Amino acid sequence: MSKGKLIVLEGLDGSGKATQAKLLAEHLAAQGVPVQKITFPDYASDSSALVKMYLAGQFGQHPDDVNAYAASSFYAVDRYASYKTSWGSFYEQGGVIIADRYTTSNAVHQCSKLPQEQWEEYLHWLFDYEFRLLGLPAPDRVIYLQVDPAVSQRLMTLRYHGDESKKDVHEKDTAYLARSRAAAEFCARHLSWDTVHCTSGDAMRSIEEIQQEVQQLARKTLG
């Protein structure tokens, strides 16, 4: 039996990844496609313990307090545990996986900690580590949800009802978020991700419009 397909929804905070991944999985299920939606980090699992400590600021109050390679390992372990216990067998038997974040999130957020001249070297290390050494499947398609940064910040503030204390170490650091956006744009170009532009002017496009584009891209992979 041939392996399944892995489609990743990627984007910065406030881009609507969770909503679009959920809608895509529901659409495919309604079409009779064997599908499972996964989300990273897997906060319901003990495997995300180091990720939660990192995001809570227990290793430092700024993202740069934990170097890119150490932070990448926290997330990679979480993905490995999820694959072994939750979705690996389904994928190996031909199932379709829709991922809300994946190794691609490490590519975006950890690149931003490094000088740009080191980005390609880091990406080579990251993908070799997760896909070859750990044996995790590489995505068949990555769909990058691009959102204007001003709109994204407004959406994050609304998410927490104006309570800035609820933001994690990434969300609190606006300079880090700006670097992450630059890294995301680089990754989307360099790694040939599909980009869906989610804003029109100073507002988000409708969820339905964005989902239509997401479904069209998914069909290119699934046939």
Regions inferred by a protein language model and the residue ranges of each:
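Hydrophobic anchor at the beta1->P-loop junction of P-loop NTPases
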Residues: 9
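P-loop (Walker A) phosphate-binding loop of NTP-binding proteins
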Residues: 12
